[in-house]
Amino acid sequence: MTAPDLISIEDFFGAPERTGASISPDGSRIAYLAPWRNRLNVWIQDLEEGSEARCVTADDVRSVLDYRWTDDPRWLLYLQDSGGDENHHVFRVDLHDPEADAVDLTPFPGSRVYSLEQSRDKDGVFTLAMNARSLAEFDLYELVIATGELTVIGESPGPGTGWSAGVGGDLLLSEFTDQGHMKISRRRAGSDDVTHVTTFDGSDYPYGVTLTHPTADGTGVLIDSVTNSDLTVLARIDLETGEETVVDSHPSMELDASRRAVEQSGSPLIFSRSTGELIGVRYLGERQVIHAVDADFAEVLKNVEALSDGDVGALSSDDSGKKWVVGFTHDRDPNVTYFYDHETGESRMLFRPYPHLDPRDMAVMTPVTIEARDGLPLPSYLTLPVGVEPANLPMVVLVHGGPWYRDAWRYTPGVQFLANRGYAVLQVNFRGSTGYGKAHTQAAIGEFAGKMHTDLVDGVEWAVAQGYADRDRVAIMGGSYGGYAALVGATFTPEVFAASIDYVGVSDLANFMRTQPAFARPGLVNNWYRYVGDPAIPEQEADMLARSPISRLDDVTRPLMIAQGANDARVVKAESDNVVERLRARGVEVDYLVFDDEGHGFVNPENNITFYRAVEKFLAEHLGGRAK
């Protein structure tokens, strides 16, 4: 067996040549993201083969990652924050005037925008939620694209509430009650009266009901529901009666709602661009399954899925529903993007984002199930290096964030980089992960630094018993909650992990919760407060401290690396500073990287390259993997 050559860090973590394509409403053009001055920007290109592409945004500070077509071919919108602070603003681009600068349509200091949606009822109008009036509250606005006029159509009645647009001028209000339940109400067009529709048990929804999409006829709302099921299904709430009925479900997979909400990667529901009718539903198990609930879309889906052995990812159509652009999720050949014309049957590849990466040199991501010590099944993924005997390998346990999230089958540059350096990579969907039923998620209540962590240790034991991993050469690495898990590995079980890498991770659970932005706190009731505790209650604060790595730094005996974004609004830099200062004060070496222009996760390519160059050196020194 021959291992592939070392692939450069730049090839893994540099910007893709093209990615994120979607088709225009009239079907004549595509937009996509591609580098301009080493930052991803939006480019426009006619669909005719051989046509010239044009860059229409000009951000050389931070990559543009989110853009929207509008129903007017003149305007395109995109969202951008500053240095990773997550305070996204809406910018307008004039596609008819290449010399015109982008215009910030929400120029309010300290505010952030989310839920930017094309109006169903008014041409040239988007709705958006923004906290410009009060940083703790999000009001709903109508935005006239051509003029930039903003009008409040739903003022927040208080923190923990949010309006969304219904049909025909109706508005829907979602709000957390004092008990943490989630209440949905309706305000009819032309009325100030808000009428209660239904209330959900908040304990079943760590992030609340993440999906509330009005039906095309305006009589109901589509939601992700676990009312009568362990697995999340698609249900409809009747806005007159509050009655809930199941619209679609899968016998063994969950509706892929919560993961997509965390990633902000779009709805699990697929709608007709012209009618707004539901046509498809995404479920996720080991791989994705899409249920077509419309006969015409079923034919489209059959032909589109035949283009790749990957899973259908980003999918867009023109208004006619005949022309489609689709990117595919894949473990070794990411986001290969095709054009498909359903009327003519024509299809062609538009691009591969990373043409310099040979899929044959990439490692296969294999689903495995590991049994925890108490018998709980742990759906996991194992990636083994190419061209290496899969025995007694150095291994990295890569822990996902959230923790109310899940790992899924797809290309991850960090995983492929580690595999190329000779490491086995194990990703465990430990208890608390979403996507496997509410019982799997709720098994994590009270188990931070407890069974959530022993699930990871059990994953190590499984990999050693299977012969894949060398017990003495196992590292733990992760971001956000995964960074917390890495610190728990370094402080609670230093005998298990030869090295730990914390990426924007929590070190002090109580301090983490105290430093959350005001607008986020009402949403913590069913996740952090329910699963971990309330730092305002002394007994619970003491328990949180006992489960925090900051309280056990004297137990750090193995090598530790920490990486932090200076502008992180979720896990503030002080979380990492405190760990580093205390360890260094007693003479313990810790590698510490701080990136001044990043937040909760790194975006700029040069920062990711710097970070993974340090990871490569750190792991090679302490686990013995390959390095340049």
What are these regions, as identified by a protein language model?
Residues 1-3, 7:
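Sequence/structural signature of beta-propeller modules
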Residues 395, 419-429, 591:
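A fold-wide structural signal in alpha/beta-hydrolase
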Residues 224, 383, 398-399, 477, ...:
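Short hydrophobic segments within beta-strands
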Residues 284, 401-402, 480, 566:
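Residue-level signal for short, function-critical loop segments
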Residues 430-628:
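Active-site-proximal cap/loop segments of hydrolase catalytic domains
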Residues 391-401:
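Short beta-strand element of the alpha/beta-hydrolase
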Residues 13-19, 25, 29, 33-45, ...:
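Peripheral, non-catalytic segments that deliver or gate enzyme domains
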Residues 127, 279, 368, 397, ...:
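Hydrophobic/aromatic beta-strand patches that form the interior of the parallel beta-sheet core
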